[in-house]
Swiss-Prot record:
PANTHER family: KREMEN PROTEIN (PTHR24269), PROTEIN SLG1 (PTHR24269:SF16). It comes from Schizosaccharomyces pombe (strain 972 / ATCC 24843) (Fission yeast). The modification Phosphoserine is found at residue 354. One of its GO terms (molecular function) is mechanoreceptor activity. O-mannosylated. This is Cell wall integrity and stress response component 1. Residues 31-119 form the WSC domain.
């Protein structure tokens, strides 16, 4: 004890703890490793786009580098960020689109997000109350008879029994309602009784206003009782942490309160409609880009063909005119015809006094020239 209380040992211990915290923070803040691949839904809002996008640029420049941001999600060149992740995780092999300019990093795909942790804030995963009820029912029906399940859910403003409880007879339904209301009143009367009930069912949960515990002695009865148990007291909290445990499975789930829990079996999650909408938008976006590229290529080819045709016609008609002019000049006398001997044309012959008279009978004879003998 004296050694532990010594000042040098305390200083070294604090220094070691400080180094451990710093190294953990640095490892957590490494955004070069993909945390997971998730299906695109409407839970996140696009913050911006960039041609050469990577996780660090998305966090620092587009999302502002806030300490409350726990993760960034990238879809092609679109940046998303937040602290609560509600999307469905899928296989990492579906996020195969490399980041532009960063071939070693993946940037999701047309319908998938690549999620990277920033090392700040607290990463939370949330599901709806109906999803937790259905998960509880399915896990109870598949678990052995000795297992038990404790589910902590947030109270909703209006609640009714689900499809499994409504399909039972009216007498069993009323008895189930009375038993659940008595359980609710007993759990709300004292927090110690609810905590003891939670510990006896071999499950641990965080402190919340209302806790409902269900033991599965048989698969069908466990499913009906777990799906029919609900609370009606309103709460101001927006989310609750639930821990479900069995002999081999432990999971922590944050439950989001829903406005109404009636007819949960016929309720369609909003993420499905959002997924279909995003898929149609992505297909339209891809088809528009492909159509624009094809149109540009066809336009360039057509312009080149028209220009080549115009050049060909120009030279063709030019040679045609030359040939036509040559053929038109073939029947005419040559231009040098007027340069012949004028004696062959008496009308054009010049009559000079110094020359002899022209012989109009025979042009083949020599023309005598008169000379002065004196």
């Amino acid at each position: 004890m004296v050694f532990l209380n010594s000042s040098p040992f305390k200083g070294r211990l604090l220094f070691f703890v400080y180094l451990l915290i710093i190294s953990t923070r640095l490892v957590a803040a490494d955004m070069n490793t993909q945390y997971g691949c998730y299906l695109v839904d409407s839970s996140l809002t696009e913050q911006g786009t960039f041609t050469y996008l990577d996780p660090a640029y998305c966090y620092n420049n587009i999302c502002g580098g806030s300490d409350n941001i726990a993760f960034v999600a990238i879809r092609n060149n679109q940046c998303y960020c937040g602290s609560t992740l509600t999307a469905t995780e899928v296989s990492s092999s579906l996020c195969t689109t490399p980041c532009p300019g960063y071939g070693s990093l993946m940037c999701g795909g047309d319908l998938y997000w690549s999620v990277y942790l920033t090392g700040n804030g607290v990463l939370q995963t949330t599901v709806s109350s109906s999803s937790v009820s259905s998960t509880t029912s399915s896990s109870s029906s598949s678990s052995p008879s000795s297992s038990s399940t404790t589910t902590t859910t947030s109270p909703s403003s209006s609640s009714s029994s689900s499809s499994s409880s409504s399909s039972s007879s009216s007498s069993s339904s009323s008895s189930s309602s009375s038993s659940s209301s008595s359980s609710s009143s007993s759990s709300s009367s004292s927090s110690s009784s609810s905590s003891s009930s939670s510990s006896s069912s071999s499950s641990s949960s965080s402190s919340v206003p209302i806790t409902s515990s269900t033991s599965s002695s048989h698969s069908s009865s466990s499913s009906s009782s777990s799906s029919s148990s609900s609370s009606s007291r309103p709460s101001s909290s927006s989310s609750f942490i639930t821990t479900m445990s069995s002999s081999t499975f432990i999971s922590t789930v944050t439950v989001t309160p829903s406005s109404s829990s009636s007819s949960t079996s016929s309720e369609v999650p909003s993420s499905t409609a959002a997924l279909a909408l995003n898929a149609s938008k992505a297909s339209n976006h891809t088809s528009l880009n492909a159509g624009a590229i094809v149109g540009i290529v066809i336009g360039c080819v057509a312009f080149a063909v028209v220009m080549a045709l115009c050049i060909f016609l120009y030279f063709y008609f030019r040679r045609f005119k030359i040939r036509m002019s040559d053929s038109a000049n073939e029947g005419k006398y040559p231009s040098y015809a007027s340069e012949l001997d004028s004696r062959l044309d008496p009308a054009m012959m010049n009559r000079k006094s110094s020359e002899s008279l022209a012989d109009s009978q025979d042009y083949s004879r020599k023309i005598l020239r008169v000379t002065n003998l004196n």
